[in-house]
Amino acid sequence: MTSSLVGSEMCIRDRYNFDQVGEKDMYLLHHEEIESLAKNIPGVKRIRFFMTFGQSYLTHMKCLEDVGMLRTDPIMVDGKEVVPLQVLKELLPDPASLGPRTVGKTNIGCIFNGIKDGKKKSIYIYNVCDHQECYKEVESQAVSYTTGVPAMIGSMMVVTGLWKKPGVFNLEEMDPDPYMEALNKFGLPWKVVENPVSVDCYKTADPSVHMD
């Protein structure tokens, strides 16, 4: 993921105005969730996953890449074998310690474009989560909160029998209604906006590569 971002002139990206967060540059990435969604949602034609990164983050990653600190292959240092990326991991602060000083909000959502009742329809469903509010509740920032709460709800669906059938399944193969209702109840309320601003999935720095 990192190496595809640091060479930003080659990236597929767009700038989007996120509710309560503001305008951010977001980059097209691969994510493992796409694999099962494409398989399990009937009729889906295209799925794209975007994530935002600040310029400071990208600059730091580019510098680290330039000096070899993002390498995952072992090198010899004073007769000992070390992996640069593992060394960097040890030098960075424990992510759990960042909660008290992480401020701002996350905006996580999906834009759906399709046909309903013979007509084109577009909706944007999303959640906004505050880092400091999350820390007050569970002593963790919003990134961990928005990861842990959905997993908890999924477990609850299984334990209570709301999701129950033999075999192994991904979340999108189960009844979404009780899950979505539980998100509202357990700290991740969501909103729906009709006809949102669309995302240009193919915008690049190269004007010759551009498709709406």
What are these regions (language model features)?
Residues 23-27, 141-144:
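Hydrophobic alpha-helical scaffolding
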Residues 15-16, 157:
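Short, flexible, solvent-exposed loop/turn segments with mixed acidic/basic and small polar residues
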Residues 16-23:
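Flexible glycine/proline-enriched surface loops and loop-helix/loop-strand junctions
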Residues 1-7, 12:
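Single conserved hydrophobic/aromatic residue that forms the stacking wall/gate
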Residues 44-52, 60-79:
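Oxyanion-binding "anion nests"
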Residues 36, 57, 70-212:
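C-terminal helical cap and adjacent loop that interface with cofactors, partners, or active-site loops
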Residues 2-3, 21, 138-139:
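Short coil/turn segments at secondary-structure junctions
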Residues 22, 29-46:
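A conserved active-site cap/scaffold subdomain adjacent to cofactor or substrate pockets
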